[in-house]
Every structure is written in C-alpha cells, then in structure tokens.
Amino acid sequence: MHRQFFRLSASGLTPAAWEPPVDVFEDEREFIVVVALPGVPIERIEINYESDMLVVRADRGISFAGSSRTLHRLEIPYGAFERRIQVPNARLEAGTSEHVDGCLILRLRKTSRS
C-alpha cells in the first residue's frame, strides 16, 4: 500500500527522489490541485507554472533523526522531490494556495485573456 501512495520518481532527478500523490479537479472557473505533503512546511514548497505543467518542489527532512536515536524502520519518504502535474490546455492565472491537514491546495483560475 505504501508504494501506491509514494512512488519513486521517474523524472530522472535522483534515486532518492519521490513523488507525492495528487488529485486534480476542474470546474467552469478553475482547476484545483491537491498535493499530499504531510510534514512539509508551506515555506519550504516551491511552486512554478512552466508551459502546461504545474511544478511543485520541496524537501522533506527527517524530523526525529538524531545521533542518540536508533532507527528501526523508515517507510515515510524523505528528501527532495519534484512533482510535475500537467494541466490541460487552458489560460490560467494564480489563484490561492493553502496548506490544510498536510495537503497543499492550489487553485488556478481560468482566464480568457490572450
């Protein structure tokens, strides 16, 4: 089940790269993109729009690591990631972003501007 939610990246970054799962919704006014990022503070998330791709980058650190602790199991992915999300051809402008319950929620407004 773990592999179902956090896959190693096929984008060619590094062997340690991982991809958080995303959901993309659309209505007549906007696209809503939900990225599961528990443990990643919003200040450490970089969001860009390149061509028709929404690009989300960040680095999740291990918060409980320390020299006096013994690691018994490490299943949660850590390290840098880059997630590229293709947004269907539409003219978009930045809407809002919020971090709710470990998820980054991005709203991209549709526009008719040329």
Regions found by a protein language model. Name each.
Residues 1-114:
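Alpha-crystallin/small heat shock protein
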